[in-house]
UniProtKB/Swiss-Prot annotation:
One of its GO terms (biological process) is translation. SUPFAM superfamilies: S15/NS1 RNA-binding domain. Signal peptide: none annotated. The keyword Ribonucleoprotein applies. Keywords: Ribonucleoprotein, Ribosomal protein, RNA-binding, rRNA-binding. The gene is rpsO. This is Small ribosomal subunit protein uS15. Belongs to the universal ribosomal protein uS15 family. It comes from Lactobacillus johnsonii (strain CNCM I-12250 / La1 / NCC 533).
């Protein structure tokens, strides 16, 4: 269920603000969004997997906090990221 190293490196390269950037809010949100989408697909096939559901809720909460931080810090970067990821905000 975790994303592959290649997919993770691709996401980091796409959303990084500079070379070697792995900790910016944009990168973290993009990685969490990928994990959330994978977990959603898993839960559609495995409705009884409550442990994964709890993990999904934790990831959603973490992403929500990072999005709030980015929105308060730099609204322009927030809007660009929302559009790029296709989130409904």
């Amino acid at each position: 269920m975790a994303i592959s190293k290649e997919k993770k490196d691709e996401l980091i390269k796409e959303y990084a603000r500079h070379d070697g950037d792995t900790g910016s809010p944009e990168v973290q949100i993009a990685l969490l969004t990928s994990d959330i989408n994978n977990l959603n697909d898993h839960l559609k096939a495995n409705k009884q997997d409550h442990h994964s559901y709890v993990g999904l809720l934790k990831k959603i909460g973490h992403r929500r906090n990072l999005l709030r931080y980015l929105k308060n810090k730099d609204i322009q970067r927030y809007r660009e990221l929302i559009n790029k990821l296709g989130l409904r905000r």
